[in-house]
A protein has these predicted regions:
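Intrinsically disordered, low-complexity, positively biased terminal segments
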Residues: 2-238
Length: 238
């Protein structure tokens, strides 16, 4: 692990790589990086983890103040980098009494810590909305291993009339398209539920249990088969 400057090229490129493989993560241009550092103190550090081939595989942005390590962000491409960064934190044991920070992976940190005294809290932050269902679906990837599905979706949107419609959507070969071919199933949901589903925050099965989706349970199961289920990673502008 080596400490680098805020504008280090490898550090920025590592984040770009991470964003390219992580659902929901924003790419940061120079303006976004400027905003990222806007409220940070000058003593804030960046530590980059390098593997045996000297390739950067993870980083941590942190500040040590009043015997507390405040972790702003921890990013890693693999398990090796994750363990290396946690070992880096452990190396500061004599300098700190507590570690504070945020995680955006929706992962149970307490499970990783043996006999750790840890407090975790969940804070709602970002809110999403699909503005144009048809345009969104045109660029939306689906699971190519989920088979082929043609489903009639009845979307309710009281604010945007072009979304308030019923349409047949075909999921096949990793893509979804609007179609006029006969549908196998019918499901009904509001635009908020539709956004929650397609962004990966909740599965169709869970939304069905919460009575946010109307239709046959078999249709819900088939829809889950063709969708990816990854909770978005959103760490910017917090």
């Amino acid at each position: 692990v080596r400490r680098v400057s805020w504008d280090n090229t490898e550090f920025h490129e590592l984040h770009s790589h991470f964003a390219s493989i992580t659902h929901g993560c924003l790419f940061r241009n120079s303006l976004a990086w400027e905003e990222y550092w806007r409220w940070d103190e000058d003593d804030t550090n960046v530590a980059v983890y390098y593997n045996v081939k000297d390739k950067p595989c993870g980083y941590m942005v942190y500040l040590i103040k009043n015997d507390i390590m405040h972790i702003k962000e921890m990013v890693y491409l693999n398990r090796e980098a994750q363990k290396g960064l946690w070992e880096y934190i452990h190396a500061h044991d004599s300098m700190i009494d507590e570690v504070h920070g945020s995680t955006y992976f929706s992962e149970p940190i307490a499970f990783e810590i043996d006999d750790g005294d840890i407090k975790e809290s969940i804070r709602s932050y970002a809110m999403g909305r699909i503005i144009d269902v048809e345009d969104f679906l045109a660029d939306y990837p689906c699971d190519p291993d989920g088979g082929t599905l043609c489903i009639e979706l009845e979307i309710e949107d009281s604010l945007l009339p072009w979304n308030d419609r019923t349409c047949n959507v075909r999921f096949a070969d990793g893509h979804c398209t609007m179609t006029r071919e006969p549908a196998e199933y019918h499901l009904k949901m509001g635009i908020g539920t539709f956004t929650t589903l397609l962004l990966g925050y909740k599965t169709a099965e869970r939304l069905y249990e919460l009575e946010r989706i109307e239709g046959r349970e078999e249709a819900v199961e088939r829809l889950d088969d063709v969708l990816f289920h990854k909770i978005p990673y959103i760490s910017d502008y917090i």
